[in-house]
């Protein structure tokens, strides 16, 4: 049994996940937590796609897309799945949490809206870039595995910051490289 911050996953389950979902450890496996509990917390797909373009130029990547089933989240998911990166994407919205947790544990890095997936990822011990757009910064930096990115033009974030369109993909990319290297 591996103890990972607050969530425990058996080593065998982690290895089974690698086989079941064809997780290639020679690639950079990234969880993209594209969902969010409200529309003001969901960074637009174009920002994720811009980041995907930047990171794909220098590293072979596999993107695990974590989101819920509501229509706003599904729009973001489908826009990403219709991009040129669709073949490098694996949507998680049809899987159970029990199946998703070992996938997250196998990721090199998570990049998530301030959503349940950012909290799960950090609790699993996976370094997590939290995209803080509309909630207090403490929600995205209370864990040592969390690395917040805030909207351009802001020094901090709080409720009603309304910054989802001002998350800079270059900042995400720079932070990802810093963490991955």
What function would you assign to each model-found segment?
Residues 47-133:
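Donor-binding and catalytic core of enzymes assembling or modifying cell-surface/extracellular glycoconjugates
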Residues 35-37, 68, 140:
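Short strand-loop junctions, especially beta-strand C-caps/beta-turns
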Residues 1-41, 45:
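Mid-sequence helix-capping/hinge segment at a functional interface
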Residues 20-21, 103, 175:
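CheY-like receiver
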């Amino acid at each position: 049994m591996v103890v990972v911050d607050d969530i425990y996953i058996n080593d065998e389950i982690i290895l089974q996940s690698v086989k079941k979902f064809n997780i290639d450890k020679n690639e950079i496996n990234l969880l993209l937590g594209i969902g969010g509990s409200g529309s003001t917390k969901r960074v637009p797909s174009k920002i994720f796609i811009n980041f995907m373009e930047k990171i794909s130029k220098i590293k072979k990547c596999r993107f695990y897309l974590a989101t819920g089933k509501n229509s706003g989240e599904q729009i973001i998911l489908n826009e990403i799945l219709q991009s040129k990166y669709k073949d490098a994407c694996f949507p998680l919205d049809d899987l159970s949490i029990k199946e998703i947790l070992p996938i997250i544990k196998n990721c090199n890095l998570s990049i998530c809206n301030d959503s349940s997936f950012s909290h799960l990822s950090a609790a699993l011990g996976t370094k997590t870039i939290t995209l803080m757009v509309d909630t207090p910064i403490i929600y995205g930096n209370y864990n040592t595995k969390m690395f917040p990115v805030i909207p351009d033009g802001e020094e901090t974030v709080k409720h009603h910051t309304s910054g989802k369109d001002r998350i800079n993909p270059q900042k995400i990319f720079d932070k990802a490289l810093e963490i991955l290297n």
